[in-house]
Amino acid sequence: MAAALTVASVGLSSCVGDLDVENINPQKTSTTEYDYILNKVYANLVLTGQKGPDGEGDLDDIDEGTSSMIRQLWNANSLTTDEAKCIWGDEGIPEFNRNNWSDAHPMMKALYYRLYFGVTLSNYYLENVKGDDNETLTMRAEARFMRAMFMYYLMDLYGNVPVKTSVSSEATPQSSRSEVFAFVEKELKDIVGDGEGNEVLADKRATYGRADKVAGWILLSRLYLNAEVYTGSAQWQKAKDYADKAIKGGYSLCTEGKNGYSAYQLLFMGDNDTNGAQNEIVLPAIHDGMETQTWGGCLFIIAASNSSSKTDVNLGTSEKWGGNRVTKQFAEKFITDEAAVKDLVEPSEVAKAAGDDRALFSCAKHTISMEDESDFYSGYAYNKFTNIHSDGTQPKHTQFVDTDFPMIRLAEAYLNYAEADARLNGNRCSADGLAKIKDLRKRAHASEPSAFTLEEVCDEWAREFGFECMRRTTLIRFGKFGGDSNYYWQWKGGSVNGKQIDSKYNLFAIPNSVVSETIKQNPGY
């Protein structure tokens, strides 16, 4: 929580014209304030400005409430897929739901600027903090890790983007997706000790919320798992090797429940920094109801998935926005008997009936099929994230949440390993890959299979990582998103039963506000 991450008090803002930081004078910035700037790099995952939920936003000409990185990562990776749809009519939401966005999409513009704001903060820190002592070298490695992660998301979402490594008003030329991949790969390999230089991450974080080698290994594994999409050349063995390093890196799956909550529930609760989940959460985006107030982050995920009008699910916050619910295709990856859950309100009861601790739906008054785009009760609510504290203590704030968002957790290494293993073994997991699947399903009290195919791995990604900003990337990797795919979900392409969408949607449009002679638009937009 916020005790582990002091938010920068230095005046920071961004100019959306050149995406550089203004109002930082190096001659007036103390060493302590540079530490605050590194903290601001981390806080960029959650916060949007200098005054809590709104006021003095980081980004010019962007609605602050829509500029939260996690909120827009979630929208881009959930609403566009078989996971969820939102009933709101806010500009950009219907376009996400129906897969028909343009280069004027306001939320993808906000996310583009938010990610580059993180890159610029990282660059500013790296340009001004020098030294060869171990602490400085490690902190510089952390700033490079965060910059690499921001660049990874830019590459994943937008494809060909500029690689910015300095704070400058000069225009940075556009790089190809393969070139961005090579940059991210080299940066990550350097800072985990597999490349050049002596700026290396700690073997294991000393402070919760800081990046370490395991975070670097998992992000490398993710990078290699998607290498075929990003570069045209598969790198399954490297994905598997770095996943294996991470699995053996000193973290552990959260497998013990507490006070009536399942181990899986603990990962997404208001005290997930102390309840045992912290041993699995490798890199959290830290939240604190008093200190990190935002309309994005985990508050958005929790509040938008709950409503006070018909159901009464206590999720630990007074905010109940009634927006997001899941498609039939997502629910049916857990629910095989609709009649057994149709009258159940509490997600834990649904999970028990479904035989999978991850089936954290609220079903009463809802229909499993999303026939009506505008009705919150058309489609199940998915209440995986909560602000409830497992030890029975009260949240720090009645409105804003304490729940940390797991940007990277160890379970990803298990699924990366299993998927890469299946792809290396004729689309079926070997005994080693199957063991990783069994570990996750055993934790969820789900049936343990005797065999697992690559197609089943795709569904397991949905079960394990629903609402964690993973689904769009997964579907593209499996050839189930844009282009010649026969995998449909409700409202894909604007049809209630789903239909194919153009392959151009495998990338988002570069915001039209930055397209220029040096930054070209993606094909089809």
Name each region found by the language model.
Residues 15-16, 31, 85-86, 115-116, ...:
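Long, intrinsically disordered, low-complexity segments
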Residues 88-110, 331-409:
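Flexible, polar/acidic helix-loop-strand segments at domain edges
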Residues 15-69, 518-525:
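Membrane-proximal, proline-rich intrinsically disordered regions
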Residues 31, 35, 39, 43-49, ...:
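Conserved, well-structured interaction surfaces
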